[in-house]
Protein backbone atom coordinates (compact mmCIF):
# COMPACT_ATOMS: atom_id res chain seq x y z
CA UNK A 1 0.00 0.00 0.00
CA UNK A 2 1.62 3.22 -1.17
CA UNK A 3 0.88 6.88 -1.67
CA UNK A 4 0.78 8.03 -5.31
CA UNK A 5 4.19 8.86 -6.72
CA UNK A 6 3.15 12.48 -7.32
CA UNK A 7 2.08 12.94 -3.69
CA UNK A 8 2.19 16.53 -2.46
CA UNK A 9 1.42 18.21 0.84
CA UNK A 10 -2.10 18.78 -0.48
CA UNK A 11 -2.92 15.08 -0.83
CA UNK A 12 -4.43 14.72 2.64
CA UNK A 13 -6.36 17.96 2.19
CA UNK A 14 -7.85 16.55 -1.02
CA UNK A 15 -9.46 13.75 0.98
CA UNK A 16 -11.19 16.18 3.34
CA UNK A 17 -12.27 18.37 0.40
CA UNK A 18 -13.74 15.40 -1.47
CA UNK A 19 -15.72 14.33 1.60
CA UNK A 20 -17.07 17.84 2.20
CA UNK A 21 -18.09 18.31 -1.43
CA UNK A 22 -20.23 15.17 -1.22
CA UNK A 23 -22.57 17.07 1.09
CA UNK A 24 -23.20 19.64 -1.64
CA UNK A 25 -24.86 17.04 -3.84
CA UNK A 26 -28.65 17.14 -3.65
CA UNK A 27 -28.90 19.19 -0.46
CA UNK A 28 -32.50 18.94 0.68
CA UNK A 29 -32.27 20.17 4.27
CA UNK A 30 -30.71 23.23 5.89
CA UNK A 31 -29.49 24.48 2.52
CA UNK A 32 -28.92 28.00 3.82
CA UNK A 33 -26.79 26.73 6.71
CA UNK A 34 -24.84 23.85 5.18
CA UNK A 35 -23.83 25.42 1.86
CA UNK A 36 -22.07 28.46 3.42
CA UNK A 37 -20.36 26.20 5.97
CA UNK A 38 -18.94 23.98 3.24
CA UNK A 39 -17.82 26.97 1.19
CA UNK A 40 -16.05 28.39 4.25
CA UNK A 41 -14.41 25.02 4.83
CA UNK A 42 -13.14 24.88 1.25
CA UNK A 43 -11.79 28.41 1.62
CA UNK A 44 -9.97 27.35 4.80
CA UNK A 45 -8.35 24.52 2.87
CA UNK A 46 -7.40 26.82 0.00
CA UNK A 47 -5.89 29.40 2.35
CA UNK A 48 -4.00 26.80 4.40
CA UNK A 49 -0.24 27.29 4.07
CA UNK A 50 0.89 24.64 6.55
CA UNK A 51 -1.64 21.87 7.05
CA UNK A 52 0.37 20.29 9.86
CA UNK A 53 0.01 23.35 12.07
CA UNK A 54 -3.49 24.38 10.95
CA UNK A 55 -5.24 21.03 10.59
CA UNK A 56 -6.72 21.03 14.09
CA UNK A 57 -9.17 23.87 13.37
CA UNK A 58 -9.83 22.74 9.79
CA UNK A 59 -10.90 19.27 10.87
CA UNK A 60 -13.13 20.76 13.57
CA UNK A 61 -14.89 22.70 10.79
CA UNK A 62 -15.34 19.45 8.86
CA UNK A 63 -16.84 17.49 11.76
CA UNK A 64 -19.12 20.40 12.62
CA UNK A 65 -20.49 20.25 9.07
CA UNK A 66 -21.04 16.50 9.34
CA UNK A 67 -22.83 16.86 12.67
CA UNK A 68 -25.03 19.69 11.38
CA UNK A 69 -25.92 18.12 8.03
CA UNK A 70 -28.81 15.74 7.55
CA UNK A 71 -27.98 12.15 8.44
CA UNK A 72 -27.94 11.04 4.80
CA UNK A 73 -25.64 13.90 3.89
CA UNK A 74 -23.30 12.99 6.76
CA UNK A 75 -23.17 9.42 5.49
CA UNK A 76 -22.52 10.69 1.95
CA UNK A 77 -19.55 12.61 3.34
CA UNK A 78 -18.27 9.50 5.08
CA UNK A 79 -18.60 7.40 1.93
CA UNK A 80 -16.89 10.09 -0.15
CA UNK A 81 -13.97 10.18 2.28
CA UNK A 82 -13.60 6.39 2.10
CA UNK A 83 -13.79 6.43 -1.71
CA UNK A 84 -11.22 9.23 -1.91
CA UNK A 85 -8.68 7.27 0.12
CA UNK A 86 -9.36 4.01 -1.72
CA UNK A 87 -8.84 5.78 -5.05
CA UNK A 88 -5.82 7.72 -3.85
CA UNK A 89 -3.68 4.81 -2.63
CA UNK A 90 -1.93 2.42 -4.98
CA UNK A 91 -1.06 -1.24 -4.43
CA UNK A 92 2.15 -2.66 -5.85
CA UNK A 93 1.75 -6.12 -7.38
CA UNK A 94 5.46 -6.40 -8.17
CA UNK A 95 8.43 -4.14 -8.79
CA UNK A 96 7.04 -3.11 -12.18
CA UNK A 97 3.26 -3.09 -11.69
CA UNK A 98 1.06 -0.93 -9.47
CA UNK A 99 -2.74 -0.61 -9.51
CA UNK A 100 -5.27 1.50 -7.57
CA UNK A 101 -5.61 -0.08 -4.13
CA UNK A 102 -9.35 -0.63 -4.47
CA UNK A 103 -8.80 -2.72 -7.63
CA UNK A 104 -6.25 -4.98 -5.95
CA UNK A 105 -8.88 -6.33 -3.54
CA UNK A 106 -11.56 -7.23 -6.10
CA UNK A 107 -10.43 -10.82 -6.83
CA UNK A 108 -8.39 -11.86 -3.82
CA UNK A 109 -8.55 -15.57 -4.68
CA UNK A 110 -6.08 -15.00 -7.51
CA UNK A 111 -3.21 -14.31 -5.11
CA UNK A 112 -0.84 -16.88 -3.64
CA UNK A 113 -2.31 -18.57 -0.56
CA UNK A 114 -0.87 -17.91 2.88
CA UNK A 115 0.17 -20.97 4.87
CA UNK A 116 -1.58 -21.45 8.21
CA UNK A 117 -0.42 -22.34 11.72
CA UNK A 118 -2.78 -23.42 14.53
CA UNK A 119 -1.60 -23.00 18.13
CA UNK A 120 -3.61 -24.81 20.80
CA UNK A 121 -3.60 -24.04 24.51
CA UNK A 122 -2.35 -26.53 27.07
CA UNK A 123 -4.16 -25.66 30.31
CA UNK A 124 -6.96 -27.84 31.70
CA UNK A 125 -9.57 -25.28 32.77
CA UNK A 126 -13.19 -25.93 33.74
CA UNK A 127 -15.19 -23.59 31.52
CA UNK A 128 -18.01 -23.39 34.08
CA UNK A 129 -15.62 -21.79 36.60
CA UNK A 130 -14.00 -19.32 34.22
CA UNK A 131 -14.07 -15.60 34.98
CA UNK A 132 -12.46 -12.92 32.84
CA UNK A 133 -9.65 -11.12 34.70
CA UNK A 134 -9.10 -7.38 34.95
CA UNK A 135 -5.50 -6.22 35.28
CA UNK A 136 -5.08 -4.37 38.57
CA UNK A 137 -4.20 -0.70 37.86
CA UNK A 138 -2.46 -0.48 41.24
CA UNK A 139 -0.18 -3.39 40.34
CA UNK A 140 -0.21 -4.54 36.72
CA UNK A 141 1.35 -7.88 37.68
CA UNK A 142 -1.86 -8.79 39.53
CA UNK A 143 -5.32 -9.62 38.21
CA UNK A 144 -8.69 -8.83 39.74
CA UNK A 145 -11.68 -11.16 39.48
CA UNK A 146 -15.41 -11.01 40.10
CA UNK A 147 -16.54 -8.45 42.64
CA UNK A 148 -13.01 -7.14 43.13
CA UNK A 149 -12.83 -6.30 39.43
CA UNK A 150 -16.30 -4.72 39.57
CA UNK A 151 -15.26 -2.52 42.48
CA UNK A 152 -12.44 -1.13 40.35
CA UNK A 153 -14.82 -0.46 37.45
CA UNK A 154 -17.13 1.36 39.88
CA UNK A 155 -14.20 3.50 41.02
CA UNK A 156 -13.41 4.46 37.43
CA UNK A 157 -17.02 5.33 36.74
CA UNK A 158 -17.32 7.50 39.84
CA UNK A 159 -14.03 9.20 38.98
CA UNK A 160 -15.41 10.01 35.53
CA UNK A 161 -13.23 8.10 33.07
CA UNK A 162 -15.95 5.89 31.63
CA UNK A 163 -19.65 6.14 30.91
CA UNK A 164 -22.40 4.24 32.74
CA UNK A 165 -22.94 1.98 29.74
CA UNK A 166 -19.25 1.02 29.76
CA UNK A 167 -19.42 0.26 33.48
CA UNK A 168 -22.46 -1.98 33.04
CA UNK A 169 -20.94 -3.81 30.08
CA UNK A 170 -17.63 -4.38 31.85
CA UNK A 171 -19.14 -5.58 35.14
CA UNK A 172 -21.55 -7.89 33.34
CA UNK A 173 -18.66 -9.63 31.62
CA UNK A 174 -16.40 -9.67 34.67
CA UNK A 175 -18.91 -11.56 36.84
CA UNK A 176 -20.26 -13.76 34.06
CA UNK A 177 -19.67 -17.51 34.11
CA UNK A 178 -20.98 -17.92 30.57
CA UNK A 179 -18.33 -16.18 28.46
CA UNK A 180 -17.27 -19.48 26.86
CA UNK A 181 -20.79 -19.80 25.45
CA UNK A 182 -20.62 -16.19 24.24
CA UNK A 183 -17.44 -17.03 22.34
CA UNK A 184 -18.98 -20.20 20.87
CA UNK A 185 -19.21 -20.16 17.06
CA UNK A 186 -17.57 -16.74 16.95
CA UNK A 187 -14.21 -16.11 15.38
CA UNK A 188 -12.32 -13.06 16.55
CA UNK A 189 -10.29 -11.68 13.66
CA UNK A 190 -7.66 -9.27 14.94
CA UNK A 191 -5.84 -7.22 12.30
CA UNK A 192 -2.78 -6.34 14.33
CA UNK A 193 -3.18 -9.06 16.95
CA UNK A 194 -0.05 -8.03 18.88
CA UNK A 195 -1.46 -4.56 19.58
CA UNK A 196 -0.91 -3.63 23.23
CA UNK A 197 -4.42 -2.25 23.54
CA UNK A 198 -5.95 -5.13 21.60
CA UNK A 199 -7.89 -7.94 23.34
CA UNK A 200 -5.82 -10.90 22.12
CA UNK A 201 -4.33 -11.96 25.46
CA UNK A 202 -7.63 -11.66 27.32
CA UNK A 203 -9.55 -13.49 24.59
CA UNK A 204 -7.02 -16.32 24.57
CA UNK A 205 -7.82 -17.02 28.24
CA UNK A 206 -11.48 -17.83 27.44
CA UNK A 207 -12.17 -21.57 27.06
CA UNK A 208 -13.28 -22.35 23.52
CA UNK A 209 -12.30 -18.99 22.05
CA UNK A 210 -11.00 -19.02 18.49
CA UNK A 211 -8.80 -16.13 17.41
CA UNK A 212 -7.57 -15.40 13.90
CA UNK A 213 -4.52 -13.22 14.33
CA UNK A 214 -2.74 -11.16 11.70
CA UNK A 215 0.56 -9.43 12.32
CA UNK A 216 4.08 -9.36 10.98
CA UNK A 217 6.53 -12.01 12.08
CA UNK A 218 9.02 -11.09 14.77
CA UNK A 219 9.50 -10.95 18.52
CA UNK A 220 5.91 -9.93 19.37
CA UNK A 221 4.51 -12.61 17.04
CA UNK A 222 6.61 -15.29 18.73
CA UNK A 223 5.72 -13.98 22.19
CA UNK A 224 1.99 -14.29 21.47
CA UNK A 225 2.39 -17.88 20.29
CA UNK A 226 4.31 -18.73 23.46
CA UNK A 227 1.59 -17.05 25.55
CA UNK A 228 -1.03 -19.37 24.05
CA UNK A 229 1.04 -22.46 24.80
CA UNK A 230 1.66 -21.32 28.38
CA UNK A 231 -1.69 -19.86 29.50
CA UNK A 232 -4.54 -20.74 27.13
CA UNK A 233 -7.05 -23.55 27.81
CA UNK A 234 -6.79 -26.68 25.68
CA UNK A 235 -10.03 -25.75 23.93
CA UNK A 236 -8.73 -22.33 22.88
CA UNK A 237 -6.98 -21.85 19.57
CA UNK A 238 -4.96 -19.13 17.87
CA UNK A 239 -4.74 -19.33 14.07
CA UNK A 240 -2.11 -17.23 12.32
CA UNK A 241 -0.36 -17.08 8.95
CA UNK A 242 2.92 -18.97 9.10
CA UNK A 243 5.73 -16.53 9.95
CA UNK A 244 3.17 -13.72 10.04
CA UNK A 245 1.81 -11.49 7.28
CA UNK A 246 2.28 -7.82 6.43
CA UNK A 247 -0.98 -5.87 6.16
CA UNK A 248 0.68 -3.20 4.01
CA UNK A 249 2.11 -5.53 1.38
CA UNK A 250 -0.14 -8.61 1.63
CA UNK A 251 -3.61 -7.11 2.10
CA UNK A 252 -5.44 -9.12 -0.60
CA UNK A 253 -3.77 -12.35 0.55
CA UNK A 254 -4.82 -11.66 4.14
CA UNK A 255 -8.42 -10.97 3.11
CA UNK A 256 -8.58 -14.28 1.24
CA UNK A 257 -6.88 -16.11 4.11
CA UNK A 258 -9.56 -14.89 6.53
CA UNK A 259 -12.31 -15.97 4.13
CA UNK A 260 -10.68 -19.40 3.82
CA UNK A 261 -10.57 -19.79 7.63
CA UNK A 262 -14.26 -18.96 8.12
CA UNK A 263 -17.67 -20.18 7.00
CA UNK A 264 -20.77 -18.22 6.11
CA UNK A 265 -22.52 -19.36 9.31
CA UNK A 266 -19.68 -18.13 11.54
CA UNK A 267 -20.08 -14.87 13.43
CA UNK A 268 -16.87 -13.03 12.63
CA UNK A 269 -15.77 -10.23 14.96
CA UNK A 270 -13.54 -7.97 12.85
CA UNK A 271 -11.17 -5.65 14.69
CA UNK A 272 -8.71 -3.20 13.04
CA UNK A 273 -5.96 -2.78 15.63
CA UNK A 274 -2.66 -2.27 13.80
CA UNK A 275 -0.86 1.04 14.24
CA UNK A 276 2.19 2.71 12.72
CA UNK A 277 3.75 6.14 13.13
CA UNK A 278 3.29 9.01 10.71
CA UNK A 279 2.03 8.66 7.16
CA UNK A 280 2.42 4.87 7.33
CA UNK A 281 -0.57 4.81 9.68
CA UNK A 282 -2.84 6.16 6.92
CA UNK A 283 -1.64 3.49 4.50
CA UNK A 284 -2.09 0.82 7.15
CA UNK A 285 -5.65 1.90 7.96
CA UNK A 286 -6.59 2.03 4.28
CA UNK A 287 -5.25 -1.52 3.87
CA UNK A 288 -7.26 -2.73 6.90
CA UNK A 289 -10.35 -0.96 5.61
CA UNK A 290 -10.10 -2.67 2.23
CA UNK A 291 -9.58 -6.04 3.94
CA UNK A 292 -12.68 -5.48 6.07
CA UNK A 293 -14.73 -4.29 3.10
CA UNK A 294 -13.80 -7.44 1.16
CA UNK A 295 -14.64 -9.74 4.06
CA UNK A 296 -17.96 -8.15 5.06
CA UNK A 297 -19.25 -8.49 1.51
CA UNK A 298 -18.78 -12.25 1.84
CA UNK A 299 -19.51 -12.75 5.55
CA UNK A 300 -22.78 -11.02 6.29
CA UNK A 301 -22.81 -12.16 9.93
CA UNK A 302 -19.69 -10.12 10.64
CA UNK A 303 -19.52 -7.72 13.57
CA UNK A 304 -17.32 -4.67 13.03
CA UNK A 305 -15.70 -3.80 16.34
CA UNK A 306 -13.11 -1.09 16.81
CA UNK A 307 -11.71 1.17 19.50
CA UNK A 308 -12.30 4.85 18.82
CA UNK A 309 -9.88 7.46 20.09
CA UNK A 310 -10.95 10.41 22.26
CA UNK A 311 -8.09 12.46 20.79
CA UNK A 312 -10.03 13.56 17.72
CA UNK A 313 -12.95 15.91 17.06
CA UNK A 314 -15.97 14.40 18.82
CA UNK A 315 -19.69 14.92 19.14
CA UNK A 316 -20.46 14.67 22.85
CA UNK A 317 -23.51 13.22 24.60
CA UNK A 318 -25.46 15.99 26.37
CA UNK A 319 -24.74 14.54 29.83
CA UNK A 320 -20.99 14.55 29.21
CA UNK A 321 -21.12 18.11 27.92
CA UNK A 322 -23.01 19.22 31.04
CA UNK A 323 -20.47 17.48 33.27
CA UNK A 324 -17.61 19.29 31.52
CA UNK A 325 -19.32 22.65 31.98
CA UNK A 326 -19.98 21.93 35.66
CA UNK A 327 -16.35 21.00 36.25
CA UNK A 328 -15.21 24.21 34.58
CA UNK A 329 -17.13 26.27 37.12
CA UNK A 330 -15.41 24.49 40.02
CA UNK A 331 -11.79 24.90 38.90
CA UNK A 332 -9.43 26.96 41.11
CA UNK A 333 -8.80 30.65 40.47
CA UNK A 334 -5.11 30.18 39.60
CA UNK A 335 -6.10 28.27 36.47
CA UNK A 336 -8.10 31.23 35.15
CA UNK A 337 -5.12 33.47 35.88
CA UNK A 338 -2.80 31.05 34.05
CA UNK A 339 -5.10 31.05 31.03
CA UNK A 340 -5.12 34.86 30.93
CA UNK A 341 -1.35 34.99 31.35
CA UNK A 342 -0.90 32.75 28.30
CA UNK A 343 -3.28 34.92 26.23
CA UNK A 344 -5.80 32.11 26.21
CA UNK A 345 -3.46 29.47 24.78
CA UNK A 346 -3.41 27.42 27.98
CA UNK A 347 -6.43 25.96 29.76
CA UNK A 348 -9.00 26.69 27.08
CA UNK A 349 -12.56 25.54 27.92
CA UNK A 350 -13.30 22.28 26.16
CA UNK A 351 -16.69 23.46 24.92
CA UNK A 352 -17.31 26.88 23.32
CA UNK A 353 -19.99 29.09 24.84
CA UNK A 354 -22.08 28.83 21.67
CA UNK A 355 -22.06 25.66 19.62
CA UNK A 356 -23.97 24.17 16.74
CA UNK A 357 -26.72 21.58 16.78
CA UNK A 358 -24.48 19.25 18.81
CA UNK A 359 -21.75 19.71 21.39
CA UNK A 360 -18.47 19.53 19.48
CA UNK A 361 -15.29 18.75 21.43
CA UNK A 362 -11.94 19.18 19.73
CA UNK A 363 -9.82 16.50 21.39
CA UNK A 364 -6.95 16.77 18.91
CA UNK A 365 -3.45 17.33 20.25
CA UNK A 366 -1.43 18.93 17.45
CA UNK A 367 1.60 16.76 18.26
CA UNK A 368 -0.27 13.73 16.92
CA UNK A 369 -0.09 15.05 13.38
CA UNK A 370 -2.74 15.15 10.63
CA UNK A 371 -1.97 11.63 9.39
CA UNK A 372 -3.08 10.10 12.69
CA UNK A 373 -6.38 11.98 12.61
CA UNK A 374 -7.01 11.09 8.96
CA UNK A 375 -6.44 7.40 9.75
CA UNK A 376 -8.78 7.43 12.76
CA UNK A 377 -11.41 9.39 10.85
CA UNK A 378 -11.34 6.76 8.10
CA UNK A 379 -12.17 4.13 10.72
CA UNK A 380 -14.99 6.32 12.03
CA UNK A 381 -16.38 6.67 8.51
CA UNK A 382 -16.25 2.90 8.00
CA UNK A 383 -18.25 2.28 11.18
CA UNK A 384 -20.94 4.73 10.10
CA UNK A 385 -21.29 3.16 6.64
CA UNK A 386 -21.17 -0.41 7.96
CA UNK A 387 -23.91 0.25 10.51
CA UNK A 388 -26.30 2.62 8.76
CA UNK A 389 -25.94 1.46 5.15
CA UNK A 390 -24.48 -2.06 5.12
CA UNK A 391 -26.78 -3.34 7.89
CA UNK A 392 -23.94 -4.83 9.93
CA UNK A 393 -23.59 -5.00 13.70
CA UNK A 394 -21.10 -2.33 14.72
CA UNK A 395 -19.62 -1.25 18.04
CA UNK A 396 -16.96 1.43 18.30
CA UNK A 397 -16.56 2.54 21.93
CA UNK A 398 -13.93 5.07 22.87
CA UNK A 399 -10.83 3.67 24.57
CA UNK A 400 -8.75 5.71 27.04
CA UNK A 401 -5.40 7.34 26.40
CA UNK A 402 -2.75 4.72 27.21
CA UNK A 403 0.93 4.41 28.00
CA UNK A 404 1.66 2.15 25.05
CA UNK A 405 5.23 1.55 23.93
CA UNK A 406 4.68 3.64 20.79
CA UNK A 407 3.48 6.58 22.91
CA UNK A 408 6.03 6.55 25.73
CA UNK A 409 8.83 6.16 23.18
CA UNK A 410 8.49 9.93 22.89
CA UNK A 411 9.87 11.20 26.19
CA UNK A 412 7.98 14.50 26.14
CA UNK A 413 4.64 12.76 25.54
CA UNK A 414 5.38 10.25 28.30
CA UNK A 415 5.92 13.15 30.71
CA UNK A 416 2.67 14.79 29.60
CA UNK A 417 0.77 11.60 30.48
CA UNK A 418 2.20 11.62 34.00
CA UNK A 419 0.81 15.11 34.69
CA UNK A 420 -2.52 14.59 32.94
CA UNK A 421 -4.46 13.42 35.99
CA UNK A 422 -4.04 16.83 37.64
CA UNK A 423 -7.04 17.93 35.58
CA UNK A 424 -9.65 15.57 36.98
CA UNK A 425 -11.04 13.30 35.60
CA UNK A 426 -8.25 12.92 33.01
CA UNK A 427 -6.40 9.64 33.51
CA UNK A 428 -3.81 7.81 31.43
CA UNK A 429 -4.10 4.01 31.60
CA UNK A 430 -1.38 1.41 31.46
CA UNK A 431 -1.89 -0.52 28.23
CA UNK A 432 -2.50 -3.90 29.86
CA UNK A 433 -5.15 -2.42 32.17
CA UNK A 434 -7.01 -0.73 29.32
CA UNK A 435 -6.73 -3.88 27.21
CA UNK A 436 -8.43 -6.04 29.82
CA UNK A 437 -11.13 -3.40 30.48
CA UNK A 438 -11.97 -2.94 26.81
CA UNK A 439 -12.09 -6.70 26.26
CA UNK A 440 -14.68 -7.00 29.04
CA UNK A 441 -16.76 -4.26 27.43
CA UNK A 442 -16.49 -6.00 24.07
CA UNK A 443 -17.57 -9.40 25.39
CA UNK A 444 -20.82 -7.83 26.60
CA UNK A 445 -21.45 -5.72 23.51
CA UNK A 446 -21.09 -8.54 21.00
CA UNK A 447 -23.86 -10.47 22.75
CA UNK A 448 -26.42 -7.95 21.50
CA UNK A 449 -26.51 -9.32 17.97
CA UNK A 450 -30.26 -8.98 17.39
CA UNK A 451 -30.18 -5.20 17.37
CA UNK A 452 -33.07 -3.09 16.08
CA UNK A 453 -32.90 -1.58 12.63
CA UNK A 454 -30.71 1.56 12.80
CA UNK A 455 -32.72 4.70 13.40
CA UNK A 456 -31.94 6.99 10.47
CA UNK A 457 -33.33 9.94 12.44
CA UNK A 458 -30.46 9.76 14.93
CA UNK A 459 -27.18 11.52 14.30
CA UNK A 460 -24.57 8.98 13.08
CA UNK A 461 -22.12 10.19 15.72
CA UNK A 462 -24.30 8.70 18.45
CA UNK A 463 -23.05 5.28 17.32
CA UNK A 464 -19.79 5.91 19.19
CA UNK A 465 -21.27 6.78 22.59
CA UNK A 466 -22.25 3.30 23.76
CA UNK A 467 -19.77 1.59 26.07
CA UNK A 468 -17.17 4.33 25.95
CA UNK A 469 -14.22 4.52 28.33
CA UNK A 470 -12.87 7.91 27.25
CA UNK A 471 -10.37 8.38 30.06
CA UNK A 472 -11.90 11.69 31.16
CA UNK A 473 -11.49 13.54 27.85
CA UNK A 474 -15.27 13.91 27.47
CA UNK A 475 -15.80 15.55 30.84
CA UNK A 476 -12.52 17.42 31.33
CA UNK A 477 -13.18 21.18 31.55
CA UNK A 478 -10.23 21.96 29.24
CA UNK A 479 -9.13 20.82 25.80
CA UNK A 480 -6.33 18.30 25.62
CA UNK A 481 -4.30 20.64 23.43
CA UNK A 482 -4.48 23.53 25.92
CA UNK A 483 -3.39 21.51 28.96
CA UNK A 484 -0.48 19.71 27.31
CA UNK A 485 2.19 22.23 28.33
CA UNK A 486 0.91 22.41 31.92
CA UNK A 487 0.71 18.61 32.00
CA UNK A 488 4.35 18.43 30.93
CA UNK A 489 5.46 20.81 33.68
CA UNK A 490 3.47 18.95 36.34
CA UNK A 491 4.60 15.55 35.09
CA UNK A 492 8.19 16.71 35.13
CA UNK A 493 8.18 18.26 38.59
CA UNK A 494 5.34 16.99 40.79
CA UNK A 495 4.18 13.46 40.02
CA UNK A 496 6.13 10.19 40.06
CA UNK A 497 5.99 7.86 37.08
CA UNK A 498 2.82 5.78 36.99
CA UNK A 499 1.07 7.78 39.72
CA UNK A 500 -2.66 7.10 39.99
CA UNK A 501 -5.00 9.30 42.09
CA UNK A 502 -6.39 7.41 45.06
CA UNK A 503 -9.94 8.30 44.02
CA UNK A 504 -9.45 6.36 40.76
CA UNK A 505 -8.65 3.13 42.61
CA UNK A 506 -11.09 0.75 44.25
CA UNK A 507 -11.48 1.18 47.98
CA UNK A 508 -11.62 -2.04 49.93
CA UNK A 509 -14.85 -2.17 51.94
CA UNK A 510 -14.75 -3.14 55.58
CA UNK A 511 -16.80 -6.19 56.68
CA UNK A 512 -19.23 -3.82 58.38
CA UNK A 513 -19.74 -1.83 55.16
CA UNK A 514 -20.30 -5.01 53.16
CA UNK A 515 -22.85 -6.30 55.68
CA UNK A 516 -24.68 -2.97 55.87
CA UNK A 517 -24.90 -2.66 52.09
CA UNK A 518 -26.01 -6.26 51.56
CA UNK A 519 -28.68 -6.11 54.29
CA UNK A 520 -30.05 -2.87 52.87
CA UNK A 521 -30.34 -4.48 49.44
CA UNK A 522 -32.01 -7.57 50.93
CA UNK A 523 -34.56 -5.42 52.76
CA UNK A 524 -35.37 -3.44 49.63
CA UNK A 525 -35.83 -6.63 47.62
CA UNK A 526 -38.10 -8.20 50.26
CA UNK A 527 -40.29 -5.10 50.39
CA UNK A 528 -40.53 -5.03 46.60
CA UNK A 529 -41.50 -8.70 46.34
CA UNK A 530 -43.58 -8.70 49.56
CA UNK A 531 -41.73 -11.80 50.68
CA UNK A 532 -41.67 -13.12 54.25
CA UNK A 533 -38.55 -12.34 56.23
CA UNK A 534 -36.60 -15.39 57.29
CA UNK A 535 -37.04 -17.47 54.18
CA UNK A 536 -33.75 -18.84 52.87
CA UNK A 537 -32.37 -16.79 50.00
CA UNK A 538 -30.99 -18.60 46.94
CA UNK A 539 -27.23 -18.25 46.65
CA UNK A 540 -27.47 -16.80 43.14
CA UNK A 541 -29.68 -13.98 44.44
CA UNK A 542 -27.28 -13.26 47.30
CA UNK A 543 -24.35 -13.04 44.87
CA UNK A 544 -26.31 -10.64 42.66
CA UNK A 545 -27.12 -8.41 45.63
CA UNK A 546 -23.47 -8.30 46.65
CA UNK A 547 -22.60 -7.33 43.10
CA UNK A 548 -25.15 -4.51 43.23
Regions found by a protein language model. Give the residues of each.
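Non-catalytic protein-protein interaction scaffold segments in large eukaryotic complex-forming proteins
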Residues: 1-66
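Extended charged low-complexity segments that act as oligomerization/scaffolding linkers
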Residues: 1-7, 219-264
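Low-complexity, highly charged intrinsically disordered N-terminal segments
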Residues: 40-162
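Acidic/polar, low-complexity linker and loop regions
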Residues: 143, 147-191
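Secondary-structure-rich domain cores
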Residues: 171-230
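Structural alpha-beta junctions
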Residues: 207-213, 229-235, 264, 289-306, ...
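Extended alpha-helical scaffolding regions
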Residues: 243-316
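Long, contiguous domain-sized segments
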Residues: 305-539, 544-547
Amino acid sequence: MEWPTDRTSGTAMAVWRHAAEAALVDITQDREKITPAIENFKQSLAACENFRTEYRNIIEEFVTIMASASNEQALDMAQAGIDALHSLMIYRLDSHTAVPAKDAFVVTSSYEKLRTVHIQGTQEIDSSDFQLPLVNPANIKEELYGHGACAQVDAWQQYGVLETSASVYAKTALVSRSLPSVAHRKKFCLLGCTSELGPARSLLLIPGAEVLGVCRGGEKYTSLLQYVEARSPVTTRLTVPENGADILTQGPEIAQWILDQTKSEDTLVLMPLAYADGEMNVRLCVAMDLIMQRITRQRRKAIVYQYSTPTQVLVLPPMAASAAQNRLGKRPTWEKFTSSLSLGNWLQPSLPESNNDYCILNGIATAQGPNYILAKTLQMWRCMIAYYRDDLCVSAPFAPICRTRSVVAYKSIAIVLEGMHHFEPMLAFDASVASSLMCAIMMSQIQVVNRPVPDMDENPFTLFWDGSAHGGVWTCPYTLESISTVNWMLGRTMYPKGYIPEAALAKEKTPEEKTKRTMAAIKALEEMEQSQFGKPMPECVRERLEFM
